[in-house]
Amino acid sequence: SIVTNLSGVSAGGLVAYTKLVTPILNSSFALALGLYVNNLLPGITVKAIAVVGICILFVLNLLGMDIFAKVSKILSTILLITMVLYVVFGLTQIKQPIFQFSGDKMFTGGFKGFMLAALLLINSANGYYNILWYGKDAKKATKDVPFASMACVPCLLFIYVGLAMVTGGVLPHDEVAGAPTILPAAQAILPGAVYKIFMIGGPIMAIITTLNGVFNDVRYPLAQAAKDGWLPKFILKENRFGAPYLIYTYTLIVVLIPIVTDMSIVTITNIFQVITFFMNVTVVYAISRLPKRYPEAWAKNKFHFSNGALYTFC
């Protein structure tokens, strides 16, 4: 609705239909969950864990927003505490020259490897954007949503940079390069029992919290698209807990398809980037039109800055 209002009907339709395929990204998170749990339970395949995990979260989200919010708070708190403790401890264990940028171990994958790593990082740090979809249910949307979104920045900087430094600094390059997870580094510096606790409270919890939000991240855009006439209105049907079960079921199917067809995490990520590039450009262009479409409201905005600064930011 926002994009349609600011940029026209065609732009709104592009965003609406793009949202039909964006859940595919969460297939990579489900597979990552499988990789981590498989390290604790090697008798269960990665694919089976991924499928069962996303199905459990699907059922959980069918129980309504209240359950979703309570579970998210608990899981996120455990995750934050675990990651901060691991980074703080891990920084004291660094033995490799991680800041020797001219060394032969830097940028071994060349420009292509660097860009692929950057794309993976972007995909892992887009939660701040998805907070926007919760504005409808927020008690003080104009205050809480911007604050929550901006609060993600320092958290991401500390945790992601810290994890990268620890993972690349505690073991020789050859032992961690190309590793699909941060587990080799964690296993090297943590005692056995502590390592397993870290696995559950850190990586596994991080993936679960991400997957837990996928259904609601898709719910609001698709529901609004249906209300605006882009999608059939029957998908708005809700169960007795207020959950749009048809939208959730569709989301589940989209997430499961790449898993059961054995797509790699990198392939899923690249597909997602191509699909969402045009949507993101459309959204940014719409934002740049705010001063022209709503000059008075823009001038009174709490986060107001000059038009030139807005265009530069966009």
Question: Which residues make up each language-model segment?
Answer:
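Hydrophobic transmembrane alpha-helices that form the core helical bundles
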Residues: 1-62, 203-224, 264-278
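Transmembrane alpha-helical segments of multi-pass small-molecule transport proteins
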Residues: 15, 40-67, 79-89, 124, ...
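TM-loop-TM module centered on a large, flexible mid-protein loop between adjacent transmembrane helices
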Residues: 1-8, 39-41, 150-212, 231-267
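Structural signal for membrane-spanning alpha-helices in multi-pass inner-membrane proteins
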Residues: 57-64, 83-90, 160-168, 255-262, ...
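Helix-loop-helix junctions that connect adjacent transmembrane segments
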Residues: 74-196
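C-terminal membrane-solvent junction of multi-pass transporters and transport-like membrane proteins
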Residues: 234-245, 280-314
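Short amphipathic alpha-helical coupling elements at transmembrane boundaries
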Residues: 1-8, 39, 70-73, 133-147, ...
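Alpha-helical transmembrane segments of integral membrane proteins
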Residues: 10-16, 47-52, 70-80, 114-117, ...
